[in-house]
């Protein structure tokens, strides 16, 4: 009986350890939020009030490899209803794509980060 109980405890702990937490699980009323990408050197910085997004890259190789570049500088709130936490990014299975959600109005955008010329933010209708 004791072995079965120990086995069940180990099994339940292993299930909990394998559970994945969604990227957006952390709730905050902050103006800016960093999102991890599958590339260890790259993050996406989101203005949670306006939906504006920047690609941020860091490096240990030197300053020429560190940069912050615009993905979308369009204020998607158009100046109305700007409140922290209005916009949030969600990972997709494609490492270069995220979904941007307007949590108040329900609008969505495809966000693609990458090299110059590959970056885009497209409204999903």
PLM feature spans:
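Short, solvent-exposed interaction modules
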Residues: 73-107
């Amino acid at each position: 009986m004791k072995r079965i109980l120990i086995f069940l405890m180990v099994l339940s702990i292993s299930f909990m350890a394998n559970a994945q937490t969604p990227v957006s699980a952390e709730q905050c009323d902050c103006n800016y939020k960093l999102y991890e990408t599958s590339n260890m050197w790259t993050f996406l910085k989101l203005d949670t009030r306006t939906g504006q997004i920047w690609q941020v890259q860091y490096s240990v190789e030197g300053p020429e490899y560190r940069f912050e570049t615009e993905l979308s500088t369009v204020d998607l709130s158009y100046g109305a209803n700007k409140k922290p936490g209005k916009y949030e990014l969600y990972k997709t299975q494609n490492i270069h794509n995220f979904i941007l959600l307007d949590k108040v109005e329900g609008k969505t955008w495809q966000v693609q980060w990458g090299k110059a010329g590959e970056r885009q933010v497209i409204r999903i209708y």
